[in-house]
Amino acid sequence: MDIQSNVLTITSGSTPTDTSSNGQAAKSTKERIKRSDFPSDFVFGAATASYQVEGAWNEGGKGMSNWDYFTQSQPGGISDFSNGTIAIDHYNMFKDDVVVMKKLGLKAYRFSLSWPRILPGGRLCHGVSKEGVQFYNDLIDALLAADIEPYITIFHWDIPQCLQLEYGGFLHERVVKDFIEYSEICFWEFGDRVKYWITLNEPWSFTVQGYVAGAFPPNRGVTPKDTEETQKHARLHRGGGKLLAAFKYGNPGTEPYKVAHNLILCHAHAVDIYRTKYQESQGGKIGITNCISWNEPLTDSQEDKDAATRGNDFMLGWFVEPVVTGEYPESMIKYVGDRLPKFSEKEEKLVKGSYDFLGINYYTSTYTSDDPTKPTTDSYFTDSHTKTSHERNKVPIGAQAGSDWLYIVPWGIYRVMVDMKKRYNDPVIYITENGVDEVNDKSKTSTEALKDDIRIHYHQEHLYYLKLAMDQGVNVKGYFIWSLFDNFEWAAGFSVRFGVMYVDYANGRYTRLPKRSAVWWRNFLTKPTAVPLKNEPEKSEDRRKRLRGST
């Protein structure tokens, strides 16, 4: 099909390309993207996650999470040896942070709840933390007072460490019962004001980085002889980092499929509880967020086209197809065989249709080709029989950002959206994360670090291609920036910055300053005459003293 023929050509199975004489027409069109190009009820927001921003790891009765334990006991697993003990101190600074959101013109804030902050002992029988519940109540109330809609993620990778130690966390089916209990507490405590729920964030990342690559807790996966290939795969998506020298070996050919299966059942049961007991009275919606690095065929061969489809199946389809159809993708059933768990008839009915919307986190794309090599051992990384590359004929798929896995490929978001509409029954979609990082260059002054034109262009171009997909009938309802603030980026620690708001880690006060991209978003979302953002110092001397460790 031809879309805006003077600017762009997109045909089925092809990569969008400029058709203007020098590409300048396309560039200028993207730069002119504006709020009014989207429906008036289209939601623009920003996103964070509990461990990445809250800090206060042992305040208010909070229990230890798997990430608390991992980063504090094995600091070598984080590229800069940092942790989220303080993170960016959102726990103590949330009121000021809501003011920032309001000034930016955001209408929604997506954040996650910390399971061990609400249930320090992992389950209800060990008690609910009143302080933890109060923190989230205060945050929700502050958002609503600022006319900002809360979008809550129930689980964004921080399981109570006590459950990890007791039975292996998501590797054991016992986690389903505990997750149901935790989810219901969330619905009960916050559902009167929260109208958008996300059960899980990127179950693919949690599963693969934790149980195949060994880069996330519980650091299970490969054996020593697998390290070179696994290191390559570990860097293919956000958050992947270096492998630990002493991580715990598991079985990368079976464990990820068990973990994923339990995650899907956790999701489905939580949705069932919400729909059965809370949705009618509370009037909310519930879904799941998944990630996709779009797999583009390396060549026009049928083998590579099929491989690209498998690549998408083994990442996005692994978790989306079950909630849409009740079954895993056919390619996974074929290539994984008996190692892929099966849903019982009852579970299939529970899982199928367990969503009101689908969240998508999109950052990048990759070239994919067929790999007919027969592996010597079973592993998720080789089960799809695919090879990935960020180059075609020595030409990168896009400009590289701060992380070695993130290449800027705006047209990939269009491909994902159109493919989802076609394959998954035209679902309601929210872009729950989209963003780009820069290296945290400590030699730069804070003033220099605020100049992030790369981020402005990244968002302009992705919004442009997202709008093209919407013009083709894709039912996208919202877009969330990753991230609102610079924060702790998992295995990358504080070595990269994703925020539109700069966080000054060095001054000990975690001062927030608007980058150029924040100003761009402000202008995009509000009237040109809006009051500009100001670089105001922190107001709380007590907070400064506490963070410095003084009295």
Swiss-Prot record:
The active site is at 202 (proton donor), 433 (nucleophile). GO terms for biological process: carbohydrate metabolic process; defense response; protein complex oligomerization. SUPFAM superfamilies: (Trans)glycosidases. The keyword Manganese does not apply. It catalyses: oleuropein + H2O = oleuropein aglycone + D-glucose. Residues 1-33, 532-551 are annotated as: Disordered. One of its GO terms (molecular function) is beta-glucosidase activity. The record marks 405 as: Controls the gate shape and acceptance of substrates. Its EC number is 3.2.1.206. Transmembrane segments: none annotated. Optimum pH is 5.5. Signal peptide: none annotated. A motif (Nuclear localization signal) lies at residues 542-550. One of its GO terms (cellular component) is nucleus. It comes from the Eukaryota. A beta-D-glucoside binds at residues 52, 156, 201-202, 363, 433, 482, 489-490, 498. Expressed in expanding leaves and in young drupes, mostly in the developing seed coat tissues, the perisperm and the mesocarp. Also detected in shoot and root meristems, flower buds, developing ovaries and tapetal cells of the anther. Not detected in embryos or endosperm, or in leaf trichomes. It is found in: Nucleus. Major beta-glucosidase activating oleuropein into a potent protein cross-linking agent. No activity with rutin, luteolin or p-nitrophenyl-beta-glucopyranoside as substrates. Belongs to the glycosyl hydrolase 1 family. This is Oleuropein beta-glucosidase. The gene is GLU.
